[in-house]
Amino acid sequence: MKVLEDLYYSKDHVWVKVEGDKAYIGITDYAQDSLGDAEYIELPEVGTEFTAGDVLGVIESAKAASDVYIPVDGEVIEVNNAVAEDPSLVNSDPYGSWLVAVRLKDKAQVEKLMKAEEYKKFLET
């Protein structure tokens, strides 16, 4: 499984990339591999506010429908429509195919997420 060094990871197999007070959020290589071929992705609208642990969206595959849990508090400021229109992008490029961008409410929450090495160890358990 591919794990990128410059991202933060949740136990729900969601990655977070921080740029200033903005965070891009997507699913990990492990998550997309477990789900199988994504067929449909339901994403929130711009302006939607979330608290860490809320369901951000749903990814449906032939195997299952899986909730995507947001690991930080924030307001959606951008939605990746390309992924909504072509869900297979999360399979072919899970780290390049972010789902949403949020304005972070508390950057300290990101520091509580796993860094790459911790996430790799988590995957081994």
From Swiss-Prot:
Cofactor: (R)-lipoate
N6-lipoyllysine modified-residue sites: 63
Pfam family, one: GCV_H
Keywords: Lipoyl
GO BP annotations, alphabetical order: glycine decarboxylation via glycine cleavage system
Cofactor, how bound (note): Binds 1 lipoyl cofactor covalently.
Lipoyl-binding domain residues: 22-103
Disulfide bonds: none
Source organism superkingdom: Bacteria
Transmembrane segments annotated in the record for this chain: none
Its job: The glycine cleavage system catalyzes the degradation of glycine. The H protein shuttles the methylamine group of glycine from the P protein to the T protein.
Similarity comment: family membership: Belongs to the GcvH family.
HAMAP family assigned: GcvH (MF_00272)
Quaternary structure and interacting proteins, as annotated: The glycine cleavage system is composed of four proteins: P, T, L and H.
Name the UniProt record assigns to this protein: Glycine cleavage system H protein 1
